[in-house]
From Swiss-Prot:
Highest taxon of the lineage: Eukaryota
Name this polypeptide is given: Putative beta-carotene-binding protein
This protein's record includes keyword Transmembrane: no
Classification via PANTHER family: BCDNA.GH05536-RELATED, PROTEIN TAKEOUT-LIKE PROTEIN
SMART domains per record: JHBP
Tissue specificity field: Deposited in the epidermis and cuticle of male locusts during their sexual maturation.
InterPro entries, per database record: Haemolymph_juvenile_hormone-bd, To_sf
Keyword terms, alphabetized: Transport
Key word Nucleotide-binding present: no
Length: 250
């Protein structure tokens, strides 16, 4: 069975990683008991706004699907600096849809208009770092108040279907969409600083909702495997087939 393990031991990090991986199917539809909204699809997102070197684009009503296939590659929880680092990949595709408004010149071709978009990323990866500080809650328990979040995405292989540039001329509209898909890798790469900042903001907001709902000690007990803390926080999580004994001291 699971025994207590020092939080500074390598087992602690393995337990956190295993727990988070097993929690992902639950997170897909949301876990209200810990303040976690559904992530597949991921909705209710702020607009993505990019304006640099004559390339203006705004993405509204963004919805992202495919995140329930996320694989957690590595997790590091530093309970001294209150820093959490997560590295993950999504085998297959994640797909973002919404409404784009663009005013740009790409490879000498002017593109201006507004309409629906679909962007798919094949085998993307993401690194997220959350940093905070313990804060007293209204019930006398200690909660983690996040002070910063950063994210870095490696978009894998992007493809795009974008409409709204020539809505009155279907052949031109089809040509513009085909062109957008061809240049999608370069365009997404140019958007990367904006996407990283946006993803960091989303991670901060979504993670803070959890850390404001579940006390710091319940999530990461000092001498209790992190997974046990998650079991306490999420009713019914103990039914998931998590082989914790493989990672704990006996």
């Amino acid at each position: 069975g699971v025994q207590t393990s020092n939080a500074s031991s390598p087992d602690f990090q393995l337990l956190v990683r295993a727990s988070l991986q097993q929690l992902i199917p639950e997170l897909a539809s949301g876990v209200p008991s810990i303040g976690a909204e559904g992530v597949d699809p991921l909705r209710g997102l702020p607009p993505i706004v990019h304006n640099s070197n004559g390339f203006k684009v705004q993405l509204d009503d963004v919805s992202i699907s495919g995140l329930s296939a996320t694989l957690i590659n590595d997790v590091n929880v530093d309970l001294t600096s209150n820093t959490i680092r997560i590295q993950a990949t999504v085998p297959g595709y994640i797909t973002a849809t919404g409404i784009q408004t663009t005013d740009a010149e790409i490879m000498g071709i002017p593109l201006k208009g507004s309409g629906p978009f679909t962007i798919s990323l094949a085998n993307p990866s993401l690194a997220v770092t959350l940093t905070g500080a313990p804060s007293a809650g209204p019930n006398g328990q200690t909660y983690l108040r996040l002070t910063s979040a950063s994210a870095a995405i490696e978009p894998g292989t992007p493809t795009a279907d974008i409409k709204g540039f020539f809505p009155q001329f279907p052949p031109l509209e089809a040509a513009a969409s085909a062109f957008a898909s061809v240049v999608a890798p370069d365009v997404v790469q140019s958007l990367k600083p904006t996407l990283d900042k946006w993803l960091g903001g989303v991670a901060l907001q979504r993670a803070q909702a959890v850390f404001s709902s579940v006390s710091y000690d319940a999530l990461f007990p000092g001498r209790t495997p992190a997974a046990v803390g998650l079991y306490r926080a999420v009713p019914g999580l103990h039914t998931l087939p998590l082989p914790l004994s493989a990672f704990a001291y006996h």
